[in-house]
């Protein structure tokens, strides 16, 4: 299995609406590891590690997010693989 890590920056109305909780839940549902973290500028940083196909599915989900959020844009970049335990909310 070819595993990788990708870092996402999600912009929009994504803080104070349960975005990190739902992101963590979706990541675990897909078997990914990583984290979701609020940034000072109002964006959310998401790190996801796992099989490329699952990360692609996760990216599609991030484009919409939960119903409580309004996602304006998602940027995506590959980063060095790091082993994470679970999918944390930071």
From Swiss-Prot:
The active site is at 20, 38. Transmembrane segments: none annotated. The keyword Metal-binding does not apply. Keywords: Hydrolase. Pfam families: Acylphosphatase. Its EC number is 3.6.1.7. It is an enzyme of class 3 (hydrolase). It catalyses: an acyl phosphate + H2O = a carboxylate + phosphate + H(+). GO terms for molecular function: acylphosphatase activity. Residues 5-90 form the Acylphosphatase-like domain. Belongs to the acylphosphatase family. This is Acylphosphatase.
């Amino acid at each position: 299995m070819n595993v990788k890590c990708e870092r996402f920056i999600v912009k929009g109305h994504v803080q104070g609406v349960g975005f990190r909780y739902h992101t963590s839940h979706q990541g675990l549902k897909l078997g990914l590891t990583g984290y979701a973290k609020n940034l000072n500028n109002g964006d959310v940083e998401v790190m996801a590690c796992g099989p490329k196909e699952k990360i692609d599915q996760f990216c599609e989900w991030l484009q919409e997010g939960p119903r409580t959020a309004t996602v304006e844009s998602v940027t995506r970049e590959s980063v060095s693989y790091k082993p994470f335990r679970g999918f944390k909310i930071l």
